[in-house]
Amino acid sequence: MRREVFESVSTNASNERVHVAPKIAAEEQDYEEKECTEENSLSQNHKSSNVITENDSKKKNLDEEDDCSVASSMKNAKSKVTHGTAPRFRSAQRAEKRKEYYQKLEEKHQALEAERIELEQRQKEEQEAAIKQLRKNLKFKANPVPDFYYQRPPVKPELKKFPLTRPKSPKLNLSRRKSCSDAITSSGEENSNSQNRQSVVE
């Protein structure tokens, strides 16, 4: 029994040793890492201190330059005397420009209005011409009636043309009393004239 207990203790001790060794190695690594981080932090602190000192020196230089510039500006202000000047207003120029702009705008509006009126008149004329043409086309055009619809006038009979009579001078009786011989001769002449007339009429 004693041997078994001793062996178990010895085995436990050997196991503990085996387990203790890696713990020590890990602690050594942590210590080395801490040393490295401390060295890095020291170097960074040193660099930051250098940067701070440089910034402080720059600020000091800027403050000195500001003081110098303020002093020089004060000297210049004391040496120069400002004279009051009346303000320059550009209202007249602006009014002229505004007037020109409004004038151009008005001309543009007038041109557009004239163009619109002209376009309306042209459209109205075109519509009236189209309406007139349509009315002309809608009218019924009468064709001429054929000749056989007309009644011809009756035929006039031809008149015979008779020869013209020859005028004769009338014989005036100067004396109321006529002798027998004169009466016979006059009656004979009248008979001959009447015969001639009848022959001409036939």
UniProtKB/Swiss-Prot annotation:
Q: In which tissues is it expressed?
A: Expressed in seedlings, cotyledons, hypocotyls, roots, leaves, flowers, inflorescence stems and siliques.
Q: Where is this region: Disordered?
A: 1-97, 142-202
Name any one GO molecular function.
microtubule binding
Q: What is its main location?
A: cytoplasm
Q: Does the keyword Coiled coil apply?
A: yes
Highest taxon of source: Eukaryota
Q: Where is the composition biased (Acidic residues)?
A: 27-38
- Single GO biological process annotation from the record: microtubule cytoskeleton organization
- What Pfam family is a match, any one? TPX2
For bias type Polar residues, the affected ranges are: 39-54, 182-202
Q: Is Coiled coil one of the keywords UniProt gives this record?
A: yes
Report the locations given in the UniProt record. Answer: Cytoplasm, Cytoskeleton
**Which key words tag this protein in UniProt?**
Coiled coil, Cytoplasm, Cytoskeleton, Microtubule
Q: Which InterPro entries match?
A: TPX2_C, WVD2/WDL1-4
Q: Any coiled-coil ranges, and where? A: 92-143
GO cellular component terms, alphabetically, are: cortical microtubule
The record's function comment reads: Microtubule-associated protein (MAP) that regulates the orientation of interphase cortical microtubules. Able to bundle microtubules in vitro. Modulates both rotational polarity and anisotropic cell expansion during organ growth. Promotes clockwise root and etiolated hypocotyls coiling, clockwise leaf curling, but left-handed petiole twisting.
Family to which this protein belongs? Belongs to the TPX2 family.
Question: This protein is called what?
Answer: Protein WAVE-DAMPENED 2
Species of origin reads Arabidopsis thaliana
Q: What lineage is on file? A: Eukaryota, Viridiplantae, Streptophyta, Embryophyta, Tracheophyta
